Amino acid sequence: MISGVLYALLAGLMWGLIFVGPLIVPEYPAMLQSMGRYLALGLIALPIAWLGRVRLRQLARRDWLTALMLTMMGNLIYYFCLASAIQRTGAPVSTMIIGTLPVVIPVFANLLYSQRDGKLAWGKLAPALICIGIGLACVNIAELNHGLPDFDWARYTSGIVLALVSVVCWAWYALRNARWLRENPDKHPMMWATAQALVTLPVSLIGYLVACYWLNTQTPDFSLPFGPRPLVFISLMVAIAVLCSWVGALCWNVASQLLPTVILGPLIVFETLAGLLYTFLLRQQMPPLMTLSGIALLVIGVVIAVRAKPEKPLTESVSES
């Protein structure tokens, strides 16, 4: 249990970096950032895939199709929506919307996967969800009070919608990915991360070319193919690809095999906490008291959720009888 939580913590620390990436290169469209990140990931995965080609051959066609669906929803579409939301609403607000994942995932895990992983009684789960929900509200209120430069309701609202879409994408990814890993305990998490990175390569390459064509027609002054700050953009995409997409996904895959889905869900809060930490470091300011109170409630909620013990899976009970 402890090792699984530590792996989830490390994944959250890595994933938190994605909230500051769009702020470093705000002049780059979200489409270019999303495709650039996963194009870098796919290229990095090529030599690793060659070294692990024996394990990759063990995957069936349906496994590769699952990897493709996962990478489309949990990588490309998710990051495109998130980067767009961050540029429209600011990093803290988008971070807190993504922060609803610790509430969304365990609820759906309890509804969908209780027969396999064991059901966590709603009476045990409710205090954790309430703490997390109040904590998220506190941080969100604090950030809205902080204000946004050049505020535009239409742009802000569209950013909220895009952030909500990214929540749906990642919730589906987390549940479906954990389900595959739990159903395939003989498959190494690194092999599965490599497979997802590989199928990302052709999709992201096509997407990057489409983004360049669109920019060339809509914004002819935009320098192509790597924008006005090519060295910064390429370095940032490679760093995010390695730390967030590779190391983060690997750690999360290990945690997914070690922990029940209903407990794994609340641990997504580590990503939210890391994103807030990095954002305030970038701002070079201390978070306000309400934000700190919200963070404390988030941590308390996670501790309550992790300490709760799921009931025995129904499948095991049937097999034993």
Swiss-Prot record:
GO terms for cellular component: plasma membrane. Keywords: Cell inner membrane, Cell membrane, Membrane, Transmembrane, Transmembrane helix. It is a multi-pass membrane protein. Residues 1-4, 52-65, 114-120, 176-194, 252-261, 307-321 are cytoplasmic. It comes from the Bacteria. SUPFAM superfamilies: Multidrug resistance efflux transporter EmrE. It is found in: Cell inner membrane. The chain crosses the membrane at residues 5-25, 31-51, 66-86, 93-113, 121-141, 155-175, 195-215, 231-251, 262-282, 286-306. Residues 13-141 form the EamA domain. Residues 26-30, 87-92, 142-154, 216-230, 283-285 are periplasmic. Its main location: membrane. PANTHER family: INNER MEMBRANE PROTEIN YTFF, OS03G0707200 PROTEIN-RELATED. This is Inner membrane protein YtfF. The gene is ytfF.
